[in-house]
A protein has these predicted regions:
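Short beta-strand element of the alpha/beta-hydrolase
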Residues: 26-34
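Alpha/beta-hydrolase-fold enzymes
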Residues: 115-171
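Conserved alpha/beta-hydrolase
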Residues: 41, 46-70
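Glycine-rich nucleophile elbow surrounding the catalytic serine of serine-hydrolase chemistry
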Residues: 107-117
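N-terminal cap/lid segment of alpha/beta-hydrolase-fold proteins
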Residues: 1-23
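Active-site glycine-rich loops that stabilize anionic/oxyanionic intermediates
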Residues: 34-37, 109
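Alpha/beta-hydrolase active-site loop
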Residues: 77-95
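Alpha/beta-hydrolase fold nucleophile elbow
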Residues: 98-109
Length: 171
C-alpha cells in the first residue's frame, strides 16, 4: 500500500492511498468514503479487491482522517463542490497512471452522495459506479434540513460543529 498526497481544491493536502495487486490489474476501483470515516477503514476491503486483480485508490476527504487541518474535523473548505473536485483530482491522477484500465467508483454513505454529484458533473470519467448506503428524502425534508444547516452555520460559523445537527444525524 502506497501513501501519497495531492493538493485539495479548497487548499491543504489530501491524504491518499493506493493498493496494488500482485497480478496484472483488471481495473481501478476508487473508493469514496462516508461521513465521519477515513480510508483506513477500507484497508481490508482494498486488500480483498487486490487479491482479485483490482487496483484500489482512495482519498481522505478534507476534514477526515489524514486530511484534517488543525481542528477543522469534517470541514470541506469551499464547500461540497470542492470535495467533488477532489474526487476528480484523484481520478485524473490515477487514470493517467493506469491508462486503458476500466475505472470503477464505489461511494458509500456520504460518499454515495459525493459520487452521485460527480456522476452528473463528470459523466465521461468512469466506466461503472457502485452506490452503497445511499438515501433519498422528500423535497420538503431536504429543504427543512438545508434551512436548519444554514441557520446553524450562521449561528456558529462555517467551521464549527453543530451539536444539534450532530445529534440529529448520528443520534
Amino acid at each position: 500500500m502506497e501513501i501519497f498526497y495531492i493538493p485539495s481544491t479548497g487548499g491543504g493536502q489530501l491524504h491518499c492511498r493506493k493498493w496494488l495487486p500482485e497480478s496484472k490489474p483488471k481495473a481501478v476501483v476508487q473508493l469514496v468514503h462516508g461521513i465521519a470515516e477515513h480510508i483506513g477503514r477500507y484497508d481490508h476491503f482494498a486488500r480483498f479487491l487486490n487479491q482479485h486483480g483490482y487496483i484500489v485508490t482512495a482519498e481522505d476527504h478534507m476534514g477526515h482522517g489524514g486530511s484534517i487541518v488543525g481542528d477543522l474535523k469534517g470541514y470541506f473548505n469551499g464547500g461540497w463542490m470542492n470535495a467533488v473536485a477532489d474526487v476528480k483530482a484523484l481520478h485524473d491522477k490515477t487514470a493517467a497512471e493506469h491508462p486503458g484500465l476500466p475505472y470503477i467508483f464505489l461511494g458509500h454513505s456520504m460518499g454515495s452522495f459525493l459520487l452521485r454529484t460527480y456522476l452528473y458533473t463528470y459523466p465521461e470519467a468512469l466506466n461503472a459506479a457502485i452506490i452503497s448506503g445511499t438515501g433519498w428524502q422528500p423535497a420538503a425534508a431536504l429543504k427543512a434540513g438545508l434551512a436548519l444547516c444554514k441557520f446553524e452555520e450562521k449561528r456558529l460559523g462555517e467551521t464549527k460543529t453543530s451539536p444539534l445537527l450532530n445529534s440529529l444525524i448520528f443520534g
